[in-house]
Amino acid sequence: MAGLMLLSLMALLGLGAGAPLCLSRQLRMQGDYVLGGLFPLGTAEDTGLSDRTQPNATVCTRFSSLGLLWALAMKMAVEEVNNRSTLLPGLRLGYDLFDTCSEPVVAMKPSLMFMAKAGSCDIAAYCNYTQYQPRVLAVIGPHSSELALITGKFFSFFLMPQVSYGASTDRLSNRETFPSFFRTVSSDRVQAVAMVELLQELGWNWVAAVGSDDEYGRQGLSLFSSLANARGICIAHEGLVPLPHTSSLRLGTVQGLLHQVNQSSVQVVVLFSSTRAARTLFSYSIHCRLSPKVWVASEAWLTSDLVMTLPGMAEVGTVLGFLQQGAPIPEFPSYVQTCLALAADPAFCASLDAEQPGLEEHVVGPRCPQCDHVTLEAMSAGLLHHQTFAAYAAVYGVAQALHNTLLCNASGCPPREPVRPWQLLENMYNLTFRVRGLALQFDARGNVNMDYDLKLWVWRDLKPELRTVGAFNGRLKVWHSQMSWHTPGNQRPVSQCSRQCGEGQVRRVKGFHSCCYDCVDCKAGTYQRSPDDLLCTQCDQNQWSPDRSTRCFPRRLTFLAWGQPAVLVLLILLALALGLVLVALGLFIRHRDSPLVQASGGPRACFGLACLGLVCLSVLLFPGQPGPASCLAQQPLLHLPLTGCLSTLFLQAAQIFVGSELPSSWADQLRRCLQGPWAWLLVLLALLAEAALCAWYLVAFPPEVVTDWWVLPTQVLVHCRMRSWISFGLLHAINAMLAFLCFLGTFLVQSRPGRYNGARGLTFAMLAYFITWISFVPLFANVHVAYQPTVQMAAILLCALGILATFHLPKCYLLLQQLELNNPEFFLGDDARGQGSSGSGGKET
């Protein structure tokens, strides 16, 4: 500890006195295998590349303390490898570190020097470089994606392993273009995925996306935009921020971009930018007084002092972003202090000059003249920078690959001819190595999968501190209780174009953005499958749903059930009708020899009553679950008994018409045809004709059992479907004709005084028939299909009750209450006298 304090004091005193250091001469060390290094030790404030007419040198005027710290991290790692007895025993790694000035024209010079033949400054031209031995075995760096895209293609031609500690563009994962490129940072794709998941977690789907106008910003912005669109996040505005050294005309576009963002409802801005472009954007936003926003930062500028120390940054809003995790290097600050202290020691500097003659500075220029005037205070702010570990780990990755290539063990590395870069490259693929207890592995595309911390800027005095508020390791975790916002009451900002739709609603997009929409209710039979649906999903045919539903329910099988109230009422009506039929039939049988029964047709009247009872019983075919047999039997078992009933009534009406309207000579002849066997023959013919119609109906247009999924909102209806209205009407044709003839034969008949008016009963019976079935047709055609069987049952029973009430029940009343009228003169009249004189008796035979 005392020695460390002494070294620190020496460094402070030496640097404070303004004495030049020899730190730049510590950027090179000889070894059995040398690693090249490309670091942004300085930057050029005004490169003037557009005015460059000769391939001369570019002067780096501004010093970058972070670049120097990353270079020292590589230097420290090489020295640790050399001091370890297990990784490369008996061998010594060297390093050769150069400044890139963050410019391609500067980075290409040391890149060419790395590929020069060992021991010279020349690159020889060969048809085959298999046996070629360049100055370095592998290259660490560069830091930026823009430089890595250039140097990566160059080194890939020679299959020179290159491990970057900061280039994150996803284009570098292309193995066909960059077969020798590796990196100890994750691809921008991982960071973009984390950003999109963060927006989803916090409910922000209406954002602005801005990137720097360089490879890092353009590629990152493109990745983020495609991933955001795939996740339903809409980008209201998208733009690029020019780099500071571009023309003032292009820099003026920043104001227009900020104006668009300020005029919109966007409360969240994703800034995928390099440090210098981010500083430019915030300088303009502070000047233009942009309303505070949430800024989702990319890793490149999240921890940048250049941005953090910008005056007015505390007023821009909330800043949060993802920072790659890494293992701590607690010895690194003291190592930096040691390097600075040694650089101020003249004896140490003299020893470097003796050990490293011929630095070839006449070829590449001074390595880092600004490094010889650095202060410890200037470097202290970046001592704990997160990317220091990435530069440190890159050395260990190359060392482990060399260990595997040389087949080293605990006792040493077997002697062999020098390893060439392409041989080392073979052992870099899918390499697993450990750094500070952390296991790392290059995947098939040269990337390492690193976890991220979600960091939030929390302002303390003039500079923000980084608070960890979450993590991303393939899945996002956010610690909401640790979040703090710029809004009043520390409420989470809302950045949505439209409100979230409720349950059972889908989005109807307005314009070009899927996040701007109206909420539309899902109608019955459809449902909302997910909150992001644009269309309601139709339920399956065996399912149903109410309005604004989020699921479908199974349909219940339904039909005209026995227990339904309407069916129970009709069954009571059926019992009444059957009871009346049985009472009337019993009275007619009991009084079968009476004039009343004989005048009504005798046995034919009983037959007609029995058929009327069968008509009533036919309604029992309609309730219950329909089947093929019940569907086929419904109409024939209704119409055949009805034909039998109406045919007997037709004979009764014909007798009344003949006896009342025709001359006696004709009446006697026709009366004999309407009685006895001839009458039964007419009944049989009518039944046969109706049976033929029923047979044709069943063959040509058979009713079918139908499972109808859509006629009821929540149930599936099973019913018998009539296939033709014409065939249904023809089934009624014979019965309608018999009823019409009955009505026609009795309507105009004048009853004789002192005789029973049978014509009136038949007239009203036929009126009941026609009123029932004429009313049935429009009602049946327009009623819901679920109620059609009920309507037909009601029509059948009303028709039967109408005939009973108007024709049969009055006669039953006479048989029960007015027996004195049950005489031949009242019912038979002249027929009774004629039968009495002929001695034929009063009974029909």
Curated annotation (Swiss-Prot):
One of its GO terms (biological process) is sensory perception of sweet taste. SUPFAM superfamilies: Periplasmic binding protein-like I (SSF53822). The keyword Glycoprotein applies. PROSITE patterns: G_PROTEIN_RECEP_F3_4. Residues 590-601, 659-680, 749-760, 811-845 are cytoplasmic. Keywords: Cell membrane, G-protein coupled receptor, Glycoprotein, Membrane, Receptor, Signal, Transducer, Transmembrane, Transmembrane helix. It comes from the Eukaryota. Residues 19-568, 623-637, 702-727, 782-789 are extracellular. This is Taste receptor type 1 member 3. It comes from Canis lupus familiaris.
